[in-house]
Amino acid sequence: MPLTQPIPADTVDGTSAVLWRNRIQIPIHEPLIQKYIRFYQGEGRRTFSEAMEKGNNCLPRMTEILESQGVPAEMVSIVFVESRFEKNASYRGAGGYWQMMAGTARKMGLRVDRWVDERRDPIKSTKAAAKYLRTLHDHYDSWLLALAAYNAGDRPIGCVARKCCVKDGELYGRMLPARSAVYVSKVLAAMHLMREPEKYGFECPNYCKPTEFDPVLVNTPLQLEEVATWIDVPVGRLQELNPSLRLDAMLPGSGFALRLPPGSREKFDLAYEEHSRR
């Protein structure tokens, strides 16, 4: 096996102007949803604005990934509620943008170990979340129940689903456990505001063009500081491109897909060839 090899770059470009397709019917008059709409407009206004600004870098690509996997793009509102678009967010064992538990993340194909935590990668974690949400929707036949199940984790909501045929947009507050109803209401309230932020006094998002990179599969141990020196970029730039790396290093033989700044592959290959001879 070669020491390094090129791998295809992610094909999702995130440039679609239509991020919100309004596929989720929101029961907007539900008291609990209204409560959180008022909260985000008032006490939580600064938090909402800061989270949306932080999401400008990754939200377009996330929505494209969701749509490509058959999940409504608006489900990205989960990220707002779960992590405020903060990759290092962690709560009770859950981690990353989508706050997935390590076990669930691994089941969805993510790598989570001492060296790498792909829950912190906006592209890979969104693909895993889309797969998980799609599975939940296929089981419950409702995006509202899929939301509730996403939050419930191992706690069952199946009994609720069996007692009533839930259609998206129907009154749900009486059907879901209290904790799930609160969670779903937060997500739907955020979703509603994210559809028309200007209507509620928020600035129109200025979405950034998705970050480009040249991926290369590395099969030998490397430090990011070494690579940064080889290609003459700040190590912080490599950290930004490779958020899933926990220790700024690649485990030998792990086959890590290292992301390089565009145009730096040739420098990297020359330096790596020399490095491998030592």
Locations of the language-model features?
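Primarily a LysM-type cell-wall glycan-binding module
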Residues: 205-232
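An acidic, Gly/Ser/Thr/Pro-rich helix-cap/linker signature
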Residues: 1-70
